[in-house]
UniProtKB/Swiss-Prot annotation:
Primary role: Plays a central role in autophagy. Acts as core subunit of different PI3K complex forms that mediate formation of phosphatidylinositol 3-phosphate and are believed to play a role in multiple membrane trafficking pathways: PI3KC3-C1 is involved in initiation of autophagosomes and PI3KC3-C2 in maturation of autophagosomes and endocytosis. Involved in regulation of degradative endocytic trafficking and required for the abscission step in cytokinesis, probably in the context of PI3KC3-C2. Essential for the formation of PI3KC3-C2 but not PI3KC3-C1 PI3K complex forms.
Taxonomic source organism: Xenopus tropicalis
The protein, known as: Beclin-1
One of the GO biological process terms: cell division
Subunit structure of this chain's protein: Component of the PI3K (PI3KC3/PI3K-III/class III phosphatidylinositol 3-kinase) complex.
Amino acid sequence: METSKSSTMQVSFVCQRCSQPLKLDTSFKILDKVTMQELTAPLVTTAAVKPGDIQEVDSNIEETFAENRTDGVSRRLIPPARMMSTESATSFTLIGEASDGGTMENLSRRLKVTGDLFDIMSGQTDVDHPLCEECTDTLLDQLDTQLNITENECQNYKRCLEILERMNEDDKEKLEAKLKELAEDEDRLIQELEEVERNRELVAKDIEKVREEAERLEQEEARYQKEYSEFKRQQLELDDDLKSVENQMRYAQIQLDKLKKTNVFNATFHIWHSGQFGTINNFRLGRLPSVPVEWNEINAAWGQTVLLLHALANKMGLQFQRYRLMPFGNHSYLESLTDKSKELPLYCSGGLRFFWDNKFDHAMVAFLDCVQQFKEEVEKGDTGFCLPYRMDVEKGKIEDTGGSGGSYSIKTQFNSEEQWTKALKFMLTNLKWGLAWVSSQFYNK
């Protein structure tokens, strides 16, 4: 059994660049002392290594192996040299079992020496060892390229040196003449600089005299300025008193003129629009499905509208037929002259009752009747007066004569909120025109 048993020993070194496993040359097995000294000899830029260092390393380094009792194989990993210390870089792996203890010990020592040799070689240069053949060729190519560059630089320096050495005496004389000329220019410029410096000193003295004179004049100016300021202060006080009286008189005159020109109707009733709504004093008259205006605001807008028409009628001395306007804020209404017990409210609270109670619609139609009477009264004295939207009191509609030509009902029943809102907007526009006419007739005069 022992004679048929084969013993296998295998060592694994890796390339320090590509980390590929290496197969060492057989020459590593027969290293004598002379070869060791040649391989480990230091470079010119490296500190000298004593010949006995390698032997000392060999004699001091002790390696231990972990042996598996089950298969009798000793194993150890050899990492790359750049990531190891000098001692750990000598590690290797043995696979198999030696024939006897003495052979195993000699092999271990030889492999330690090989590992130490690679570490020493790595310490002599900037390249880590060992390297595979391909990485070695690549390294040699890089070194050849660097050598060619260095040789080219050396040749350039040599050519420059030859050019400098070939310079003749004429060039030297020309340079000396040029140097002499420059020296003369330097002396001339130094003299000019000295002259300028002397002139600068004279100018500095003149400046000092002028500065002293300026200080004296400034002191006199300050004294005169102080006296002037005192007189000016007294004058300003008197001017302030005079201007104060003039401003008071001017303000009183402006207020008087403003009161004379003030149009009470324009100042009290501001009719405008906000989107699709007509507004009076910023109260919107109408409502839309997308903008459900509160009824309190609509009632307040109706109250302002009734008050406006009532004021215009009083200014003209107009007495409405069939109805009397009763402005009471957001609870304004119309009183029937034929039936005084009958009141037509121009306010509403909404809700289900709103759809069945037509008094609100009757009140709006009655108000439209009053606007029509106002229009007819104005046309009696001014035939050229015309409201922008024609009103049909019998149908309770307002026609857009200048636009689409359609008519819009002022009633809420059987009517859409959009058309009702547009009819109210047209009615406010007519009132705005009536307000402008009254203002032009009674206030511009």
